[in-house]
Structure formats: C-alpha cells, structure tokens
Amino acid sequence: MADTDSFLHLARPLGPVAVGSAPTTAPLNVVIQPQAIFSILDHSLRRNADQERVIGTLLGTRSEDGTEVEIRSTFAVGHTETTDQVEVDMEYQKQMLALHLKANPKEVLVGWYATSSELNTFSALIQNFYSGQGDGTWPHPAVHLTVSTEAGKDIETRAYISAPVGVTAERAADSAAFIPVPYEIRYGEAEKSGLEAISSARDAENRATNIFTDIEALERAIEDVLGMIDRVSRYVESVIDEEAPASTALGQFLLNTLALAPKVEPADIERDFNNHIQDVLVVSYLANTIRTQMELSNRLATAQLTLGGESGGAESGAQRGQRGGKGGRGGQQRNQERGAEEARA
C-alpha cells in the first residue's frame, strides 16, 4: 500500500553543517515492513492510560545512495510529556540501540516513531536528537513515522523528514520543518497470508482463527480472484449500459491486466495441469518407497546386531569351557606322575 499524495522534493540543509561535511539532499522513499507496524501498535496498546502517545526508535536498512530507507524493526523508548516539557530516556535508547545493532549488524538507526499525527515543538526536539551527529543518523535524514491509533478510526500512517528552521541557534534546537515523503507498506506472499489470517479473526467473538492448510489457502485465493472477476464484470456491464460513469484510467488498467494473461487454450491448460498432478504423485510415491526401504534397512541392521551378539556370547562360553576342561586334564596327569614317582621310591 503506497501513499497516493503528491510530493515535491527540494534540496535542503539537514542541520548545522560542520566544516568538511556534506549533508544528503537526495529525494527519499520509505519502505515499511508489516512487523514494524505491528510492533508500534502493540506498544500503543500497552501504554499508560494518561499517555496521549508513545515513541520509539526505528531500525532498518538504507540503500547505498541513501535514497531509500526500509524500516524493519522498532523498539519502544520511555518518555514523559507534559504541556511544558518532555523527558526522553536517552540512556535507555542508546543501550537498546547498541544491543539491537549487535544482534542485527546489517540494520542501522533510521529514525523514530510516534503514535500520534500531531507535530509540535516536542516532535522537533526529538527529531533533532535523532538526526544529529554522533548518536543520530547524520549525514542521512532521520525518518519520523506517525501512526495514528485513535479508537474507532482507521490507522493512518505518515512519514516525514525534517529541515532546520529558526533565527538563532538556540531556537533551531527546538524547531524543525517536517517534510512529508512518500512511503510504502511492502509485504510478500508469506506476510500477506499472515495478515489475512489475522484479519479473519476480527469478526470472531473470541478473537481466534484457525491456520489454513495450503489447499485451503489456495481455495480461498481462487475464491477471492473469482469474486474480483465478478465485480469487474458487473462494472464493465454497467459502463456499457451507461449506468455508471466510464473511467479511462480504470479501463487502461484492466486492459494491461488482461494483457498479462497467457494466450493458452483451456484444453492445453487442463492437459498441463494433469501432467503436473501425475508428476507430483510419482514424486510422492518414490519418496514413500525410499522411506520404506530405509526403515526396512534399519530394522535388518538392528536384527543382525542382536543375533550377532547372542551367538558371540555362546561361542565365548564354549571356549571358556574347553579351556577349563584342558586345565582339569593337565592337573590330573600331573597328579598321576607324582604318585608313580613316590611308588618307585
């Protein structure tokens, strides 16, 4: 899901420029992973009742040219906010950041988030800290992500970077001009399946859902596609009957989508599908045969070891008996010779 707003990127300074340093002024695009959004929502649900918003740190990756930032994970940072001042536990933030970077060396600090769409002086203070030199993202801009979590309303997400404003250096420390940047919540097939499974539990009273098997997931996907096709067909019929206004953009999109469909006869598709099913069955049969053969081989090897141990024990006992018999006969012969010598004497 991408933001549909339009943006104008202008070259801008990102903070007090030090001698010999050059800030990044390239356009920026933000990519957000779903797990980062879930982490922010979980933090918002666990906040104190008297807190209007909570804040935290954004971690992720940045492209080599710095024009794209991918937000992958977050962690909460404690803060206290009143009408007059704001206090942020920066020591905790630094320690947690060091631990996260040690566990995930490929990730870097990219910015911070807040569960409120409001931008105020305190937002500028926190933004200047995250975008500063040393412990901040300098020379890259810090991304400020706002996620509105107001009950009963849809979740709204916005992404910003900042440019310094202020007449004096003292005023520039708590001032910043927030510039909206385009963002995209990007997810793959695995994340999409997980999101669909989670969303299916929202209408249940116990807030629980069952995990679908691969066949059930495929069936649901096919049903969704058939529903989309029916909805598009009804729209096209209503446009043809002049019951709905025509849209050139939508018509072009449908034309491009139909152009992606392969030009294959239904009989060929059925034949290829049946061949694929046969191949799958053959592979499954061979796998079961190999597994049975391995189990049989293991059992035969175990039986041979058991029989070999029993026969070896019997043979060793017989050999000990023979040695004992020989020892007995030798002793008897020596006694007879000793008796004969005594008789001659």
UniProtKB/Swiss-Prot annotation:
Q: Where is the composition biased (Gly residues)?
A: 322-331
Composition bias (Basic and acidic residues) maps to 335-345
Q: Where in the cell is it found?
A: Cytoplasm
Region named Disordered? 308-345
Residue span, MPN domain: 30-166
Q: Which PROSITE patterns match?
A: MPN
Offer one Pfam family short name for this entry: MitMem_reg
- Domain of life the protein comes from: Eukaryota
Q: Which UniProt keywords apply?
A: Cytoplasm, Initiation factor, Protein biosynthesis
Entry GO MF terms? metallopeptidase activity; translation initiation factor activity; translation initiation factor binding
Which biological process terms from the Gene Ontology are attached to this UniProt entry? formation of cytoplasmic translation initiation complex
Output the Gene Ontology cellular-component terms: eukaryotic 43S preinitiation complex; eukaryotic 48S preinitiation complex; eukaryotic translation initiation factor 3 complex, eIF3e; eukaryotic translation initiation factor 3 complex, eIF3m
User: Mind telling me which InterPro entries this protein's record contains?
Assistant: eIF3f, EIF3F/CSN6-like_C, JAMM/MPN+_dom, MPN
Give the main location.
cytoplasm
Query: Which PANTHER family is this protein grouped with?
Result: EUKARYOTIC TRANSLATION INITIATION FACTOR 3 SUBUNIT F, EUKARYOTIC TRANSLATION INITIATION FACTOR 3 SUBUNIT F-RELATED
Q: How does it assemble?
A: Component of the eukaryotic translation initiation factor 3 (eIF-3) complex.
Q: What's the stated role of this polypeptide? A: Component of the eukaryotic translation initiation factor 3 (eIF-3) complex, which is involved in protein synthesis of a specialized repertoire of mRNAs and, together with other initiation factors, stimulates binding of mRNA and methionyl-tRNAi to the 40S ribosome. The eIF-3 complex specifically targets and initiates translation of a subset of mRNAs involved in cell proliferation.
Q: Family membership, please give it.
A: Belongs to the eIF-3 subunit F family.
The name this protein carries in UniProt is: Eukaryotic translation initiation factor 3 subunit F
Task: Name its species.
Answer: Aspergillus clavatus (strain ATCC 1007 / CBS 513.65 / DSM 816 / NCTC 3887 / NRRL 1 / QM 1276 / 107)
